[in-house]
């Protein structure tokens, strides 16, 4: 019985945990993807591993793409200046 617990624990550690988050997708300069349509954002978000995405009109960063369940490896917009503009 103890072996079963140890094996299950080892498998859990080996598989890793992939989490996601809802956020504004950003480029490498901390600039949110600007948008005009939901289809553009959905394409960009899903291309980067999110479940879906839409254009957030007049949001915190203007008209920007909001992604649902975006992987941790994809950069998101963080507070501070957009260094590209």
Swiss-Prot record:
Signal keyword on record: yes
InterPro entries according to UniProt: LCN-type_CS_alpha_beta_dom, Scorpion_toxin-like, Scorpion_toxin-like_sf, Scorpion_toxinL, Scorpion_toxinL/defensin
Disulfide cross-links: 31-82, 35-55, 41-65, 45-67
Any Pfam family the entry gives: Toxin_3
GO BP annotations, alphabetical order: defense response
Principal subcellular localization: secreted
Top-rank taxon, per record: Eukaryota
PROSITE patterns according to UniProt: LCN_CSAB
Subcellular location as annotated: Secreted
One Gene Ontology molecular-function label: sodium channel inhibitor activity
Tissue expression notes: Expressed by the venom gland.
Signal peptide range in chain numbering: 1-19
LCN-type CS-alpha/beta domain: residues covered: 21-83
Any single GO CC term annotated in Swiss-Prot or TrEMBL for this entry: extracellular region
Keyword Disulfide bond in record: yes
Arginine amide: residues bearing it: 83
UniProt entry keywords in alphabetical sequence: Amidation, Disulfide bond, Ion channel impairing toxin, Neurotoxin, Secreted, Signal, Toxin, Voltage-gated sodium channel impairing toxin
Family membership: Belongs to the long (4 C-C) scorpion toxin superfamily. Sodium channel inhibitor family. Alpha subfamily.
Function: Alpha toxins bind voltage-independently at site-3 of sodium channels (Nav) and inhibit the inactivation of the activated channels, thereby blocking neuronal transmission. This toxin is active against insects (para/tipE).
Additional remarks: Negative results: does not affect the mammalian Nav1.2/SCN2A sodium channel.
Comment on protein domains: Has the structural arrangement of an alpha-helix connected to antiparallel beta-sheets by disulfide bonds (CS-alpha/beta).
Stated name of the protein: Alpha-insect toxin BjaIT
Species assigned in the record: Hottentotta judaicus
Organism taxonomic ancestry: Eukaryota, Metazoa, Ecdysozoa, Arthropoda, Chelicerata
